[in-house]
Amino acid sequence: RKTVIAAYDELMGQGWITTIPAKGTFVSDKLPEVNPRGKGVEKGPESAAGFSFEVRKHLHRPYAQLPSMLTIDEGIPDVRIAPIVEILRHYRSIISRSYNAKYLSYGSFFGDDSLREILANYLQETRGIACSKENILITRGSQMGMYLAAQLIHQKGGFSIVGETNYIAASLTLTDAGASLLRVRVDENGLNTNDIQALCKKHKIKSVYVTSHHHHPTTVTLSPERRLHLNELAHQYGFAILEDDYDYDFHYQRAPLLPLASADGGNHVIYMGAICKIIAPAIRVGYMVGPSDFIAAAAHLRRTIDRQGDTILEKAIGQMIEQGDLQRHSRKALKLYHERRDHFHQLLNDHLSEFISFQVPEGGMAFWVKLRKDLNWGTIAKTCLENELVIPDWKNYDSSNSGHNGIRLGFASLNFQEQTKAILILESAMKKESEN
């Protein structure tokens, strides 16, 4: 009965039928006009737009999601161990209370106030960053923070310094914002700050992008001496340090070095992190920490592209931090990923040592692996794909054409069995390539 009534309502709303009281429902005397598609004209989802627009080709990167295939990623968490039960428990407890219905409406474009306050304490305790909620903007992940910072700093162009090897998404974001990239060497101690100083003497530098804890992609840690030097240069030359601390929580050898933001006495560091890097990529909650006037400007810019995040999820994450759920998950994940790193290291030694060179990362979720110069990652990747293994695209790691022949191989999201299977396929592909 409900279906029939709904159908009648729809037909009446479109003008196909008319109801006359005490008589019945009849086909309308004047039917709605239907304009059939022109003969021979086909329109589908892949049709070209009938208007002009800008295609930013420099942002286009191939992306193929192949969930049915075994994948060695760039280094992401294992979503199978994500604390979903805890997240849902907190989410339900918030949304089930009638007086919390207000959280389903529009909220602050700075992010949930309670999470900002909780994060201020959390970042002080875990990273030594002295801040208040006015210094924090809740984002949908560190990439949003990177976009907002780049747009505000480089709206009128200017120079940004990045590593010779660099996180490609950051390079693209800076370039798209209008920055001209200047590259410096990266060695076992991270970005070469003497190179940065030399560039500062030649150009007006607006920003320096750094992944201080584990350089992306090579995984090296910026040394204490270079951290101090970089902060001094920022104060001397007045540039912003864009510190992307994407995997601070995963360090296996010792306690991690505190971020640059913890020793920022002149308000030059914009610090970006993400809860999704600890839990799972789909849990889109991150944060940006910086001077309060900059955070306010970023919040107003954020309002134009996203308005706000998921208030209830943000509150749930705040409760997880307050009650220690996030910290317990981090400790559990750290132990597991440490074991997986060691197992992956053994597999690389046992099966791929004649083809590659690498250093064991002290933290993070990936190895930086350099292939022999006579071998080609592109051919190897194609052979792997034929055997249902996906590996990262080597082109993402050498945008400056330095010829290092390296890629990142993530280990955290694969259990021992999956790691073994993947490395055996990779070994077979490398043997085939070396024989040709």
Can you describe what each PLM-predicted range is?
Residues 1-92, 303-310, 321, 331, ...:
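N-terminal basic, amphipathic alpha-helical segments
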